[in-house]
C-alpha cells in the first residue's frame, strides 16, 4: 500500500509539514509506504472549465505548465491520499484549491474511493 501526502502550505517545513511527517511516520510503523509532495509555492493555475481534459480521455489537464499533471501521476500510483493545508478564512491555501479543482475535474473518476 502507498499513501500520497500533499502539503499545500506555502511554508515548506511549517506546521502542516510537521503534521504530515508525523502521519508518514505512523504509516511507516504500520508498514505503509508514503510520499510527501509539496505544492505550497509551486505555480498552479486555476481551472478554466475548457473541458479539454474530458475530451482527451487521459485523466490529464491540457495545460501542462505547472504541478497539476505531476500530482495526478503520483496519485494514480497511490492507494490513498491525505491532504494537509493551513486554513485561510475557512479554506485551504489558494494553491491547493486550484490544484484540487483541476485534478478532480481532469481525473476525478480515477480518484473515487481513494
Protein language model features and the residues they cover:
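N-terminal beta1-alpha1 ligand-phosphate binding loop
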Residues: 2-32
Amino acid at each position: 500500500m502507498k499513501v500520497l501526502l500533499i502539503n499545500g502550505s506555502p511554508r515548506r517545513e511549517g506546521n502542516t509539514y510537521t503534521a504530515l511527517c508525523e502521519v508518514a511516520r505512523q504509516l511507516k510503523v504500520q508498514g505503509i509506504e508514503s510520499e510527501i509532495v509539496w505544492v505550497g509555492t509551486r505555480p498552479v493555475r486555476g481551472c478554466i472549465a475548457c473541458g479539454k481534459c474530458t475530451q482527451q480521455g487521459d485523466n490529464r489537464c491540457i495545460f501542462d505548465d505547472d504541478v497539476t499533471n505531476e500530482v495526478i501521476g503520483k496519485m494514480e500510483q497511490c492507494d490513498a491520499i491525505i491532504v494537509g493545508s493551513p486554513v485561510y478564512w475557512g479554506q485551504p491555501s489558494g494553491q491547493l484549491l486550484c490544484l484540487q479543482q483541476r485534478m478532480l475535474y481532469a481525473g476525478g473518476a480515477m480518484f473515487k474511493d481513494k
